[in-house]
């Protein structure tokens, strides 16, 4: 029996869920469970998810961090992968998660995201996402960087041990953005961060909406403000896109 649970936080993901559900059904080996935690969708996401055979719980108007915390608390699997609805998992995701976390020195893992849309691959943004995994902790948390900490984000399809996630308090429920970076720091005393050399496709919808250079500017400035402790109204600088 699989020991990997998948938590999918959703908010207005009616257009992305059908494709994700097909890919989840094709995972080999299959996960122990898939749990959709909805944050108050108004586009029929919950109904679509249930029609696709997915287990759904509602956790409305509390933000994505609280949704993920609720999902991790609800699932039973000892290993958990947080998968965004606009991210396309490889068919061996469960095996990769299990193999990576078999190393007791690793507390947190993630895939290498490649942003793409119907017309193009966002090579510039994908490269920036890759290098900031290293340069952000190296510049702003060098003592943790030397201990193996890297900064992962939602597009990385992060995975971890459920008991360790709960032991550090999970995500900060008050964080609108950069909650994944906070988790990387919180898990640092428990082990290293492993960026798996496996590509995972994720939607470029934010880049398409903002434009590539503006998107990278937003990513950079939000990250800098987080690193410098300037977190007031940080979420206002990261507009919601669907």
Where are these regions (language model features)?
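Acidic helix N-cap motif at the loop->helix transition within catalytic regions
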Residues: 15-19, 43-52, 92
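Conserved donor NDP-sugar-binding/catalytic core segment of glycosyltransferases
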Residues: 92-124
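Acidic donor-binding loop at a coil-to-helix junction in glycosyltransferase catalytic cores
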Residues: 177-183
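Short, flexible, basic/aromatic active-site loop/helix in glycosyltransferases
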Residues: 111-118, 127-151
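Glycine-rich, basic loop-to-helix element that forms the pyrophosphate-binding segment
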Residues: 59-75
